[in-house]
Amino acid sequence: MTSFEIVFYKTSNNICPVKVFLLDTDIKMRAKISSLMEILEEYGNFLREPYSKYLRDGIFELRCQSGNNISRILYFFYGDNKIIMTNGFIKKTNKTPKKEIELAKLRKADYIERMMNK
């Protein structure tokens, strides 16, 4: 099985939204998310529910729960083995907010464009 590498998306002004999100979460949630990221690196696109779910347009969500708090980190696959983490949020409803998916899609397009121009 191919091992995967997690890459944190950075904005054009070098801000890493997922790292900012992680710093804002409590320590238990952060630890759970970190463990799930390790599992994702190992299993990549073979990881399924309850840990990972395909949403649409190449966007997936990493699913984490700690107590009553539910977190999601959206990501996509790039190249042979890269997992690009685009944004994270605390989930308040059963459905993943459309604005979060749209943000992930915008960041995916931005990332791919910047990689093509390297």
Please give the residue ranges for each predicted region:
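Basic, Lys/Arg-enriched alpha-helical interface segments
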Residues: M1-I70, G79-K82, K92-K118
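Residue-level signal for short, function-critical loop segments
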Residues: F89
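Conserved catalytic cores of phosphodiester-cleaving nucleases, focusing on short active-site segments
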Residues: T86
